[in-house]
From Swiss-Prot:
Molecular-function GO term, any one: beta-glucosidase activity
Lineage: Bacteria, Pseudomonadati, Bacteroidota, Bacteroidia, Bacteroidales
Enzyme class: hydrolase
Recorded GO CC terms: cell outer membrane; cell surface; extracellular region
Membrane topology type: Lipid-anchor
Protein name, entry field: Xyloglucan-specific endo-beta-1,4-glucanase BoGH5A
Disruption phenotype: Cells are not able to growth on xyloglucan polysaccharide, This phenotype can be directly rescued by the addition of xyloglucan oligosaccharides.
Matching InterPro entries: BACON, Glyco_hydro_5, Glycoside_hydrolase_SF, Glycosyl_hydrolase_5, Ig-like_fold
Length: 502
């Protein structure tokens, strides 16, 4: 082998030049590859996400994008939105569509793009809003259905009272079975003179909570006994004849609706529809002074104290849509009837944060219902717990709650202006403090004053915020009216309500 001199080797001038050239070449190649990795490469959206279908109510679906260092998303229509406009690598993205009130199917596209990769198109389709087709449907009939929006109607309603613990009373057996009738909790059957007394005292509205599940003729089909419907209708007619607006609902009924999760949704929707179809048909011919309210305080009995999930809210909002669809599908005056839908657990804060307005085939004929029972330890905490007996500035420093005082009432009820300002009227379907009649002497005297101060303040704040307050009268010792004679039983509390109205 020929011996190579040191001057001809790696460290010779020529060798050094060669090394530098190779380093430059390698660096250029590395940069080129890096840029290729950043700007191009694979962009993937699984086929299962390429075609998204939504119902008319609007909702959200989640897709997964697996891309290079940077990718972009755009949507073709304003009603279809993406949670991201830009991202990198593998990420989940929410595609949300608004409710479709256009009365026709609509489509949009979502485009996912990245430099150096072909665009991926996701097709979005949303169905039109429609109601069920019932054989019992009749053409819309506006006889007795004034040309009033629900907001305009709410201004005529002013204030009302519940005839509680009566038609919604049920006895729950150890096996979960339901029985009983309107008298099983100790109140008499409502009569004509009761409703006349309510009207004479200055009230405009009566809410009649009703249960039906304990009166099924056929539990498999949810067929309600005609005799029970007759009783409810007799009370409704008596209240209307007295000149009152009347609200009927499906109340607690043992809590069968209180499992709002997707796994139960189909069965619960089916039962709710079957029951409301019968109720709507029975009361279809009444004028617009009769309002239907879909449910009551729907929550999740299986939550064990945990906060509601997005699934809970969505399914409960869906109950409202089933109710509206079912009533409208019966036609006649129900086509125009004013309907009342509920926030989750009828809670004000949850209404503001999570309520979704149901779609409707008529405009501006829906109320929202919330209840107000703050502070809990003053209003409805059981008598055998550490309740508070006093309320308000007059008793500051006394046996009052830390929350739920005047400022809190103002803040909570005024938050409902988000609906009022958008022409969605709000009914406070229940409010009122428990009467702690086990107290005596000065303690009872201060408690009674606190109750009436509270009642007046809630009503006054409702009026200020254009809300319709309905006092919860459960009968018994705290009732406003004698259920048999219709005469005032608690004149001071009635006076507090009327003072709050003025």
């Amino acid at each position: 082998m020929e011996k190579q001199s040191f001057s001809d080797g790696l460290f010779s001038p020529l060798g050094i030049k060669r090394v530098i050239f190779m380093l430059v070449l390698l660096t250029t190649s590395f940069i080129s590859c890096s840029n290729s990795d950043e700007k191009g490469g694979s962009l993937e959206v699984a086929q299962e996400y390429r075609n998204l279908e939504f119902d008319a109510r609007g909702s959200r679906q989640t897709i997964q994008i697996d891309g290079p260092a940077e990718w972009h998303i755009s949507t073709s229509e304003s009603w279809c939105k993406s949670s991201h406009t830009i991202g990198e690598g593998k990420q989940y993205v929410n595609i949300t569509v608004e409710a479709n009130d256009t009365q026709k199917e609509r489509t949009a596209t979502v485009t996912v793009s990245a430099s150096g990769a072909p665009d991926i198109i996701i097709n979005v389709k949303q169905s039109l809003y429609s109601v069920p087709a019932y054989d019992e449907y009749i053409a819309p009939d506006n006889t007795g259905m004034r040309d009033l929006t629900s907001m305009q109607l709410s201004a005529l309603m002013k204030a009302g009272v519940n005839v509680g613990n009566t038609f919604e009373a049920v006895i729950v057996g150890n096996d979960g079975s339901l029985s009983g009738d309107e008298t099983c909790w100790g109140n008499p059957t409502p009569n004509k003179v009761l409703f006349e007394g309510i009207k004479a005292a200055g009230f405009d509205v009566v809410r009649i909570p009703v249960a039906y599940s304990h009166q099924f003729e056929d539990a498999a089909t949810y067929k309600i006994k005609s005799a029970w419907m007759d009783k409810v209708e007799a009370a409704v007619k008596a209240a209307l004849d007295a000149g009152l607006y009347v609200i009927i609902n499906i109340h607690w009924e043992g809590g069968w609706l209180n499992h709002p999760v997707d796994a139960n949704k189909e069965a619960l929707d089916e039962r709710l529809e079957a029951m409301w179809k019968q109720i709507a048909l029975r009361f279809r011919d009444y004028d617009d002074r009769l309002l239907f309210a879909g449910t009551n305080e729907v929550n999740n009995d299986d939550a064990n104290g945990a906060q509601p999930t997005e699934e809970n809210y969505r399914v409960q909002n869906g109950f409202n849509q089933v109710f509206v669809n079912t009533v409208r599908a019966t036609g006649g005056r129900n086509h125009y009837r004013h309907l009342i839908v509920q926030a989750y657990n009828t809670d004000v804060a949850k209404a503001v944060a999570h309520f979704t307005m149901p779609l409707d085939i008529v405009q501006n004929r829906i109320f929202l219902e919330c209840h107000y029972y703050d502070p809990y330890d003053f209003t409805i905490m059981p008598n055998d717990e550490n309740f508070k007996s006093q309320w308000g500035a007059a008793f500051a420093g006394g046996d009052v709650s830390a929350t739920g005082q005047e400022g809190d009432i103002e803040a909570t009820l005024s938050s409902l202006n988000v609906f009022i300002n958008n022409n969605v009227p709000v009914i406070i379907g229940e409010y009122g403090p428990t009467l702690r009649d086990q107290l005596t002497g000065e303690a009872l005297e201060n408690h009674l004053k606190s109750r009436n101060d509270y009642i007046e303040y809630v009503v006054k704040t409702c009026v200020k915020n254009k809300l319709v307050p309905l006092y919860w009268d459960a009968g018994y010792t705290e009732k406003l009216f004698d259920r048999t004679t219709g005469q005032p039983h608690n004149a001071a509390s009635i006076a507090a309500i009327m003072k709050g109205l003025n």
